[in-house]
Amino acid sequence: MDASPPTAAPNDQPANPPFIRSGHLAAPGFSEHRIYWEEYGSLAGEPVIIMHGGPGAGSHSSSARFFNPQRYRVVLFDQRGCGKSTPSASDDDATPALTDNTTQHLIDDVSALRDELNINGKMHVFGGSWGSTLALAYAIAHPATVQTLILRGVFLCRRADVDYFFQGNAAEFAADPLAMPMPGAYLDFPTAWRHFVDVIPPEDRGDVVKGLAKAFSAPPRTDAERERLVKVASACVSWEGSASRLNRDENSHGQPNQKYALTAARILVRYMINGGFLGADGAGDRDNNYILDHIARLKHIPIHVVHGRYDRVCHLYQAEALVRALRDAGNNAVNYFITTAGHSSFEPETDTRLRTIMNELPPMISPEAALLQSGEMMRHAEKPSDAVGNFGDNDVGSGLE
């Protein structure tokens, strides 16, 4: 999920790859949305696109730290309604930002961004938390464009996955704050959980996500209503921030910026109440298992999964389920790493593992290089007719959608 505010990288970490350029992309279709994007590293490098978390958290330049600037062309973008994309879900009336804002719209934005930036061949797709959900959904939709999937803190966006973090013992809380009706993050962070549950009216605690959606259902009309809205949004984002790291005092997570909190919480809750817009029955279908139901679409993609053993935002069982499903589907190129860490990508072992993966990936041959390579081989072949048969359009074009 990752709706907690981004945190600066530790001072002893290498600087991010050099910034190249940024811009806004007019979203495809008849839409008001303009998608903000940035590039880092080398324009001649292997393209990698980063899917940020949340949904609604926005991108952060620190995400580029995992990539060798001589090797990679790193693309970050802010998903609809958040970060520097417009319109913003932080506005009092968030309706424009939340209109035409679904997972399918985000997938279409990635395709449009590829066109805008002239990424014509395959690319690496990198995502953590909700970013892993979007990365998987994109790869299911467009497997021919994906060279490698690199996933951290896997979130499958099933109802049980959401309830693990957001429901807990909320329904029983008023009668017994220490009730344990189901597994959940609340068991490990009781103080932070209490702060979160306290902002939800008791009558709405039977379904916390539904209660949050109710709180965000209309623009505030008075200062009091806006103050209440900010309080709920801040509690929602702070709860995730408190639970995101293994070695963080659950009481040490400060209050998020109001604009950030409104953006992140509104978009997050809209997606969660709609099952991440992944259900077969459309908006409102929270009981879906979309990713695992379509896992066969990913059987030919090399996939690296990194998950903290003590992740209490997205429990380890989600990564276990994904890896098992991939292997059962016949994907023999799955690498699975369990780190001594929580949810955050900034935890040292997780950070190191992600850097190592990116440094050790086999070099990717661009479509242009493949064409040049095939041309050289054709010129040196003893039998030109055989060479044409071996390196014809079908082979060269296999990396293109």
Task: Report residues per predicted region.
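A catalytic-pocket lid/entrance helix-loop region that shapes and gates access to the active site
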Residues: A144-V209
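Short beta-strand/loop motif that positions the catalytic acidic residue
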Residues: L298-K299, V305-H307, D311
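N-terminal cap/lid segment of alpha/beta-hydrolase-fold proteins
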Residues: P10-R34, L268
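Conserved HGGG/HGGXW glycine-rich cap/lid loop of the alpha/beta-hydrolase fold
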Residues: P28-D91
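Conserved hydrolase catalytic core segment
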Residues: G121-A160
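Conserved alpha/beta-hydrolase "acid-adjacent" motif
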Residues: R312-Q318
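Catalytic active-site module of serine/aspartate enzymes centered on a nucleophile-bearing elbow/loop
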Residues: A329, A333-E401
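Conserved acidic catalytic loop of the alpha/beta-hydrolase fold
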Residues: Q104-M123
